[in-house]
Amino acid sequence: MASGQQERSELDRMAREGETVVPGGTGGKTLEAQEHLAEGRSRGGQTRKEQLGEEGYREMGHKGGETRKEQLGEEGYREMGHKGGETRKEQLGEEGYREMGHKGGETRKEQMGEEGYREMGRKGGLSTMNESGGERAAREGIDIDESKFKTKS
């Protein structure tokens, strides 16, 4: 029990030094403030999703991502994503990060179905540093059935 309190004290110290220690708690000056901010932002997001519907909410997020990509440029946007991934890896540890990725892959396979997931992997496997999987497939005449990529309803 004491170790849980020690951990909270350490997180609070880090928050007071300006570090974000709670996902969604950016701007909070203490651990408790960051927890409250994260909770409020989460509730706000849920409310907005209910207002717009699932598809509208997803589209709004997509447009926001595209705007950010235009602001930062392709390279800056990619770098931002890389830094976010590295930060998450530090938070979860190597094993936790790997497990999170594995669970995400399993979830995606369930959403798409085995055949669609395999077809998407085929396309991804064709990619190189200089060419996307789709570009290489087109150049080499490899048929990729992207209709299989659809998420099951």
Curated annotation (Swiss-Prot):
InterPro entries reported in the protein's UniProt record: LEA_5 (IPR038956), Sm_Hydphi_plant_seed_CS (IPR022377), Small_hydrophilic_seed_prot (IPR000389)
Renumbered ranges of Sequence repeats: 43-62, 63-82, 83-102, 103-122
Function as written in the Swiss-Prot or TrEMBL entry: Lea proteins are late embryonic proteins abundant in higher plant seed embryos.
Skewed-composition ranges (Basic and acidic residues): 7-19, 32-122, 133-153
Pfam families in the cross-refs: LEA_5 (PF00477)
GO cellular component terms, A-Z: cytosol
Family: Belongs to the small hydrophilic plant seed protein family.
Domain of life: Eukaryota
Protein name: Late embryogenesis abundant protein B19.4
Gene induction: By abscisic acid (ABA) and osmotic stress.
Gene that produces this protein: B19.4
Region 4 X 20 AA tandem repeats: start-end pairs: 43-122
PROSITE patterns in the cross-refs: SMALL_HYDR_PLANT_SEED
Region (Disordered) location: 1-153
GO biological process, any: response to abscisic acid
Keywords: Repeat, Stress response
